[in-house]
Each structure stands twice: as structure tokens, then as C-alpha cells.
Amino acid sequence: CPQWGGVPAERCVQLGYYCLQLPAMAAEPGKAFGSRESQESDVRSVRRHNPLALPADIDGQPTWQNLVGDLAKLLEHYRPEVLVTPHPELDPHSDHVASTQALLEAIALSNWKPTTFLMYANHLHDNDRWPMGPAGAGIALPPAIEPLPADRLWSPLLSADTQLDKAMALAMEHDLQGGQAFKRQLRRWIQQALAGRRWPVTGSNEFFRKAVRRHELFWVRDLSD
């Protein structure tokens, strides 16, 4: 996916921490939490092609302390001014919230201090269909259910070619591959016949409709304070 987006391999780093384990890791920072699916518990298995050594390479333990240490090392190595991360108040996915928390802890630990967060939301607390409408359409602001910090917005336009590139990059994500369950596919056929709804040809997963739009939407948070 990164290489499709023009990011060279030498700037891609695999960390290898396990899905849906970040909140538990944050609650017990020194305890290792392995994969729920494969029972694997050594993050080094995916790191053999990384361009630099990281703190967790020493013991391979999937702990919160190792994650924060890895992120701090990456900050000091690449020295980014801007970081892209899930919105911790808007996106309720537990791993997304915890990943931004880990990033904030890493910034506090690191000698390098980025200046800006660009934050996005893949999910909402009360509505997983946002943004509404077809792929290629615009993105409206999410419903204002709870008060949020007063962040600025940035909404860059995407050309048709860039939208296709984004869809192709998404198609390389293993959890977005494959067809829909029969019940969901049947519901789509009914919606298509009765309401004229259409889904993108690039992928059947709902994320292809939600994520590939004619512009992006980021909340911009100043970290300089």
C-alpha cells in the first residue's frame, strides 16, 4: 500500500503489534499481549526488512512500553513536522484511540517534537455509514453529537487518478478483500433495485464507498503548546 502511494520501501517500517490488543497493552504497559488469532507473540517476525533497528527488536515483546519506545525512536530518526493519526475524540475504535495515545506518549518521551497532528475518523460513535453518499462524492462534517476541541479543518482535493490510486491501495489491505456475506449482498440488491443505490466497482467492502472521495477531511491540531 505505501509503495502504491509513492512512499519508498526504505521509508516504510513494520511494527507488528497485534490487532485489538492496544487498549489492553495501554492498561498494563509492561505486559505482553500476543495475537488473538495466531497466538503469535513476537513482533520481530514482520520486521526483517525494516530499514532501521527499533527498541522492541531486542526482545520482540508486544508491550505498550515497547510500542511507545519504537514510536519515539522513529520520531527521532525521521523528524517529522506533521503526523497523521486517528482522531482520539471522534473515532471510537479502541485500537485507533490507543494508537493516538501511544503517539502522544512517544512525543513526550522523544527529543523530537512534531508541530501538527492531521487527524481523521474512520468510524463514528453513533453512525458507521458516515460519510454518506457514493464513492467519489464529497464529505460532509459528521453530526455534532458531543463537543469536540476547536480544531481547524483541512480538506485537500483528490483528482480522479488519485482516488483510483487510493482505492487500489485499499484493495491491498487483507481485511478489505473478499466478497460480502449473502445477507448483506441480498440487502444491496434490494437497495439497488428499489432506491437506485450504487457501490464502487473497485471493491465490495463498505470502506471503498466511505473512504474514496473527491476530497479528504482532516482535523488540524497544533502540538506546539
What function would you assign to each model-found segment?
Residues 1-14:
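Glycine-rich phosphate-binding loop and adjoining beta1-alpha1-beta2 segment
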Residues 7, 20-225:
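Metal-dependent de-N-acetylase/amidase catalytic core
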Residues 15-19:
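Short loop/turn segments at strand-loop or loop-helix junctions that form parts
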